[in-house]
């Protein structure tokens, strides 16, 4: 069946325009807010306020959706899912190595909490990479 669509989402509508810098600034701001809201949610949990944590998590997810729209507007992803997954797979592999190096540095400096988290998140990046590779192997042969 042929689709006769007249209105769709488009990737990269602000790329190369005078709005590109504003969209990029908003993308970066929204990403930062996601991390801050999630950190605040963790603090709320530590303070025994789980319902506050859930509200903050919800706000973080809405901010992440905003970031996603800004990423689409500036063409930070392509219109080809396989290419996007391959791009992210490379990034996860790089993050795996960089976080492990940061863990080693933190250990040398005697900053155990930083070492522990960098080491753990390095393994998370490896897990993410394996998941993305699995998707590529199964769906994009």
UniProtKB/Swiss-Prot annotation:
GO MF, one term, reads: iron ion binding
**Superkingdom to which the source organism belongs:** Archaea
Q: Which SUPFAM superfamilies match?
A: Ferritin-like (SSF47240)
The segment(s) forming the Ferritin-like diiron domain are 13-141
Q: Which residues cross the membrane?
A: none
Supply the alphabetized keyword list.
Answer: Iron, Metal-binding
Q: Does the keyword Metal-binding apply?
A: yes
Recorded coiled-coil stretches:
none
Q: Where does Fe cation bind?
A: 63, 66, 125, 128
**Pfam families noted in UniProt:** Rubrerythrin (PF02915)
Question: Does Protease count among this protein's keywords?
Answer: no
Indicate what this protein is called per its UniProt record. Answer: Uncharacterized protein MJ0746
Q: What is the lineage of its organism?
A: Archaea, Methanobacteriati, Methanobacteriota, Methanomada group, Methanococci
